[in-house]
Every structure is written in structure tokens, then in C-alpha cells.
UniProtKB/Swiss-Prot annotation:
GO terms for biological process: photosynthesis. It is a peripheral membrane protein. It comes from Mastigocladus laminosus. (2R,3E)-phycocyanobilin binds at C82. Signal peptide: none annotated. Heterodimer of an alpha and a beta chain. Its main location: membrane. This is Phycobiliprotein beta chain. InterPro entries: Allophycocyanin_b (IPR006245), Globin-like_sf (IPR009050), Phycobilisome_asu/bsu (IPR012128), Phycobilisome_asu/bsu_sf (IPR038719). Belongs to the phycobiliprotein family.
Length: 169
């Protein structure tokens, strides 16, 4: 798992180059947003249970067939597994926010997830929608916590959505 800084260093080291203007700007941007990234992680941590609960509620309101008999979140065990997975996505998105890199998502979330879900018969579409809903809720929470610019929060959620969505359908 790498953060934005170690990823940048690795790329320039492999090329045998000094940092150019683009690299310096990337580093500057990462460090300037560092305080907001940490504040975001703190706010997400303090509200994680509520974020997951709201995400699940909204997802099941939008797609009630998931919790009806025969639905993928029908039964207490499956419902709990869905919420557990949402919590998992939130936790790793938070790591990616702080790191400023999506490497942790590739290494710990996305590798093998699609195959696992397919083998268990878990539909990817509602998972992707749940991640999108979660992003919206997180951004609302961060706005309420006084974090004005939350654009950096989009990246991990959009990345998971894109990676899961592209490869399943």
C-alpha cells in the first residue's frame, strides 16, 4: 500500500528523473489538502455507524426488492452482511482519502471482490449504488462538520464505483 507521495517518488525513481514541475505541483496539492483529509477521516470515523445505517436505509428504500423474500439482503444474516460490506467500503475509502492514493482500494478491496460476489450470487449493481449513496452521505456529513471543499472525497468512491461497475456489466 502506497500513499500519493511514495507513488510519485516510485514513478520518478523508476524513470531516473528528478521531480519536474508537475511532480512538485502534485506534492504541493497533496500537502495543502492534508489537514482537510485528516479532518475528513476524523468526521467519518465519528459518524461511521450513522453513515452506514443511512446508506443502507436509502439503498433499501430505492431498491426494496433486495429485502423482500428472495432478495439478496433478505434474512437478518444477509442484511447484516450487506451493512458489514458497506462499512468495509467506507473504512477503506477513508484510508484512500488520507493516503491520497487508490492503491489501498486495489490491494484490499477490489482484487477478487467481483469474483467473490459473483460466486456468491451477490449482484454488483446494488453494491455500486450503495457506494454512490455513501459518497453523497459522507459529503453531507463533512459539509455539516465544517469542511468546505470536499471534492477530494469523490475520488475513492468514484474509483470503487467505476472499477466494480465496468468489469461486471
Amino acid at each position: 500500500m502506497r500513499d500519493a507521495v511514495t507513488s510519485l517518488i516510485k514513478n520518478y525513481d523508476v524513470a531516473g528523473r528528478y521531480f519536474d514541475r508537475n511532480a512538485i505541483e502534485s506534492l504541493k496539492s497533496y500537502f495543502e489538502s492534508g489537514t482537510q483529509r485528516v479532518q475528513a477521516a476524523k468526521a467519518i470515523n465519528a459518524n461511521a455507524a450513522a453513515i452506514v445505517k443511512q446508506t443502507g436505509s436509502k439503498l433499501f428504500d430505492e431498491q426494496p426488492e433486495l429485502i423482500r423474500p428472495g432478495g439478496n439482503a433478505y434474512t437478518t444474516r444477509r442484511y447484516a452482511a450487506c451493512l458489514r460490506d458497506l462499512d468495509y467500503y467506507l473504512r477503506y475509502a477513508t484510508y484512500a482519502i488520507v493516503a491520497g492514493s487508490m492503491d489501498v482500494l486495489d490491494e484490499r478491496v477490489l482484487q477478487g471482490l467481483r469474483e467473490t460476489y459473483n460466486s456468491l450470487g451477490v449482484p454488483i449493481g446494488p453494491t455500486v449504488r450503495g457506494i454512490q449513496i455513501m459518497k453523497e452521505i459522507v459529503k453531507e456529513q463533512l459539509g455539516a462538520a465544517g469542511i468546505p471543499n470536499t471534492s477530494f472525497v469523490d475520488e475513492p468512491f468514484d474509483y470503487m464505483t467505476r472499477e466494480l461497475g465496468e468489469k461486471d456489466i
